[in-house]
A protein has these predicted regions:
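Short, structured secondary-structure elements
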Residues: 65-66, 118-361, 436-474, 478-485, ...
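Alpha-helical support elements that line or immediately flank enzyme active sites
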Residues: 488-492
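Secreted/luminal cysteine- and crosslink-motif detector
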Residues: 10-11, 69, 312
């Protein structure tokens, strides 16, 4: 499809591109056109770039023929100064007020460019519960807290989202793909009052749900073949990916998953995937205590939502966490040592294996090795270091004692006589109510954009209870303390059932509120959840939604270990992916780069020029959406494309412009331009 000659109708572009001129640039560097084709992170086992799906380099003049002002792009300025690439690290996102205001501004910018809701999108059944501050008026646990709090604050909530928007939103959130056109129409036509809950059950029990949440927990547990400290190899990634996938598919309780991560035994990380979690948390280049400390910090962040536990692994909290954490400011380094001591008798050891012409390693875990093999792991946490990645560990800091016995700092308990240390730690962590709070809050953030505690990995244990509020000037950390407590209690009572928790969240009226808001919006209301905050789709979601809607299924060869994949949500890791399209939407590497939601010029260029899009909008591709639709009338074709790509009918203005365009010039070319434009619209790129 040619765009270089400026064929694309300006009026069509004006209507179909919802531009809001908003571009994040917290930290940027200028890159030239010759750097657009960045390959994926290269390693010894990286698969080759696939030409059919790779980004194609185009001139800035070509890019200028499409309206990319949605990403804040001015093509004349781009031609003069190059393109800006967002670069942000995990540590940049600690300012929760800043995060909230960015989300709120983004939501206002996006929703201001969405089309007005057509009459056909009106809800066809009574859904509104009675308003009031009586929790008994609300059947959903979440609504019993959200709506009385809104009433007390004097903040009117947004109205309920339409059926068209709901099916798209919940399908993306639960499965990582947009819904099929026929499913949209059948859902909207259904007049039964329980159709939303039945749709939720359908999605939660789908194979695509397993794909989406295997990717999510792979991110959370940082399942990668290589990080800055250790190499787990693709076989290790695949083994852990399979363990996560099987755990979710079989409904394994989340506390059991956590116990297996902490207490796993095995000799081969290529066969027992959970081994890779502890191994991946190792720290090389220093004494064995560095390994133990890093694994302890990983456990605190992933399972307790307390990343700042890592801070007291180097020093007391005083002078470092005073303004950040009421608990942390008084926490002692010796408490970290007590916690780390649970892992002090666990050694990760490597076994060399030859695969083809290369030598690599698989890992095993063993407790208290035979004397003479590795004497470091025969005792409790030892205070005998002056070098390494952390400050000295010396007896003087612990009353002259040379070892520190294991004590779980939040309960004061240690292992029973003869009890395996890691088994004892697994029991302490999963019976700690903070484990349930963290699990619930991590998932809440995925559905609402921000956590009840936000950031979700920075819990302060002394600021969570509204019945025991912290002393001034400290304030309660959760936006809704009672909701967080009751939701965590419900999670425990229902057997740590992840599906049950998600079902409660998406069936709540709070989740089903519109992202549009009538009246003046105050960004401080974000934490009241008075409207749905928008989010940009993950790179994997965009890829799979384009693939599904177009009907053109790719065949990616990820190499001998990972095999062949068609869907990005099934890629075993995020560091190595076969298409740059996904990487440019900031999917992270599960190490130092977290998954981000920012937008960038690079993303705009991908949506306009990458083969993932352009190869799927051509009328000549017999397997494609257009080739299968060109026998329709113009009216039918426009409706069909909008429903297939955007899960809604076009507005009257959109339809009039699109039909007029199809009636002039070459119909096939105009149809290609229309489909290409839909893939570049705000309401395709964002989940709202």
């Amino acid at each position: 499809m040619k765009r270089t000659s400026g064929v694309l109708c300006c009026t069509l572009a004006t209507l179909l591109f919802s531009a809001f001129g908003f571009f994040y640039a917290r930290e940027g560097r200028v890159i030239g056109r010759d750097q657009l084709e960045r390959g994926p992170v290269r390693g010894t086992q990286d698969p080759p770039e696939l030409n059919s799906e790779s980004a194609t380099e185009h001139s800035t003049e070509e890019a200028g023929n499409a309206d990319c002002s949605f990403f804040g792009a001015d093509h004349d300025k781009i031609a003069a100064i190059g393109l800006r690439e967002n670069v942000r690290s995990r540590s940049d996102d600690r300012n929760q007020a800043g995060r909230g205001s960015r989300l709120g501004l983004l939501t206002m910018q996006v929703t201001s460019k969405l089309p007005s809701e057509p009459p056909s999108a009106e809800i066809k059944f009574p859904f509104e519960p009675p308003y009031g501050n009586d929790p008994g008026n609300y059947t959903n646990l979440i609504d019993r807290h959200i709506f009385p709090a809104l009433l007390t604050a004097g903040v009117p909530p947004a109205k309920l989202t339409t059926d068209y928007e709901f099916i798209r939103r919940v399908t993306l959130d639960l499965t990582g793909r947009i819904p099929m056109k026929d499913r949209v129409l059948s859902f909207v036509a259904d007049s039964s009052t329980d159709k939303r809950s039945r749709l939720v059950d359908e999605l939660i029990n789908s194979p695509e749900w397993v794909d989406k949440w295997t990717m999510y927990y792979g991110d959370l547990f940082q399942n990668t073949s290589q990080n800055t400290q250790m190499t787990m190899y693709q076989q290790g990634v695949l083994a852990m990916n399979t363990w996560i996938r099987d755990s979710l598919a079989n409904g394994k309780p989340y506390d059991q998953m956590a116990r297996e991560l902490i207490s796993v035994q095995g000799t081969d990380s290529y066969q027992v995937g959970q081994i890779n979690w502890l191994v991946g948390g190792s720290m090389g280049g220093g004494p064995y205590q560095d390994h133990v400390d890093a694994r302890t910090a990983r456990m605190g962040q992933h399972l307790l939502g307390m990343a700042h536990i890592n801070c007291i692994g180097c020093h007391d909290g005083a002078g470092h966490l005073d303004a950040l954490s009421l608990w942390g400011k008084d926490a002692k380094r010796t408490q970290f040592w007590q916690l780390a001591s649970f892992l002090s008798r666990t050694e990760a050891y490597a076994t060399n294996i030859t695969i083809g012409t290369s030598t690599q390693q698989f890992w095993g875990l063993r407790e208290a090795p035979t004397p003479g093999v590795n004497n470091n792991y025969l005792q409790d946490y030892r205070l005998n270091t002056t070098t390494g990645n952390r400050p000295a560990r010396q007896p003087a800091a612990f009353g002259g004692r040379t070892t520190v016995p294991p004590v779980y700092v939040f309960s004061g308990r240690g292992p029973a006589a003869g009890e395996n240390y890691r088994a004892a730690l697994a029991g302490e962590v999963t019976s700690d109510f903070q484990f349930a709070r963290a699990a619930v809050n991590y998932l809440w953030k995925e559905f609402f954009g921000i956590g009840i505690v936000d950031p979700p990995d920075f819990f302060d244990p002394l600021r969570l209870d509204e019945n025991n509020p912290p002393p001034a000037p400290w304030t309660l950390q959760p936006s809704h303390p009672a909701l967080l407590r009751e939701l965590a209690q419900d999670f425990v009572s229902n057997g740590y059932n992840v599906k049950d928790l998600m079902r409660k969240i998406v069936n709540s009226r709070a989740y089903q509120l519109s992202s549009r808001y009538n009246g003046t919006w105050n960004v401080t209301w974000e934490r009241l959840f008075a409207r749905k905050l928008v989010r940009r789709m993950w790179g994997e979601e965009l890829h799979d939604s384009i693939v599904q809607s177009s009907g053109i299924i790719p065949n990616y060869n990820l190499g001998t270990i990972y095999g062949t994949k068609s869907w990005a949500m099934q890629f075993p890791e995020t560091r190595i992916v076969p298409t740059q399209f996904v990487k440019d939407f900031m999917n992270g590497n599960r190490d130092e780069e977290e998954r981000l939601q920012e937008v960038s010029i690079q993303q705009a260029l991908n949506l306009m020029n990458n083969g993932v899009v352009t190869s799927r909008v051509t009328a000549s591709n017999a397997a494609g959406l257009l080739a299968r639709s060109l026998t329709m009338t113009n009216d039918e074709l426009v409706d069909h494309l909008f429903l297939t790509v955007l899960s809604r009918y076009p507005t009257a203005a959109e339809k009039s412009t699109a039909v007029t365009s199809l009636q002039t010039g070459t119909r096939n070319q105009k149809a290609e331009q229309l489909l290409w434009s839909l893939y570049n619209k705000v309401d395709f790129i964002f989940n709202y």
